[in-house]
Amino acid sequence: MPETIENQACIVIAIAGASASGKSLIASTIYKELKEELDSNDIDIISEDAYYKDQTHLTMDEREQTNYDHPDSMVHYLLVEHLRQLKQGKPIQIPEYDYAKHNRKTSSKHFEPKKIIILEGILLLTHETIRNEINVSIFVDAPLDICFIRRLQRDLIERGRSMDSVISQCRKTVRPMFLKFIEPSKQYADIIIPKGGKNRIAIDILKAQIKQLLSKK
């Protein structure tokens, strides 16, 4: 379990769920609204995607065969180390990821500790040591067919993917890994948000919970 909130430099809110379930939308909505309501810059977002393994040693064809929905595709020990450093009030260097090249960039992002850290990613609740660093865990629940449509649109427009590659990946790894790892991790969530990223009531409840936690610091 996380240490007492009063002794932490930051509060960690984790938002997990299927790929394209609405995690990023909820994270960005909470970020923007709390930043305005609290009149504070002391809130930021970390994406689990930044912690995909470096694949410089692989060819592009080999990278395209990587199972990016399996926990082994991530360097989770580094994410845990970074969360602990942030909670101690120390800055970190977050890796940066290139979706088109399926690999880390050579650059990294300097990240200062904030009072509120919103962590979003598909596999966050599958890893016990990450769960132990989380103060509030959320699982965004959305129908898989809706997630597939959103992912197809997103990857074609934002990530430079081909339609065939997205469809193949969803069939071979995304759906099977969701059923094997991600959906079972829902049991570890403090809050389950149905209807994806546009659930206004759930967002307001989550914001109220974060404000309550802040009042204890």
Swiss-Prot record:
One of its GO terms (molecular function) is uridine kinase activity. Its EC number is 2.7.1.48. Keywords: ATP-binding, Cytoplasm, Kinase, Nucleotide-binding, Transferase. One of its GO terms (cellular component) is cytoplasm. SUPFAM superfamilies: P-loop containing nucleoside triphosphate hydrolases (SSF52540). It comes from the Bacteria. It catalyses: uridine + ATP = UMP + ADP + H(+); cytidine + ATP = CMP + ADP + H(+). The keyword Magnesium does not apply. NCBIfam families: PRK05480.1, udk. Belongs to the uridine kinase family. PANTHER family: URIDINE KINASE. This is Uridine kinase.
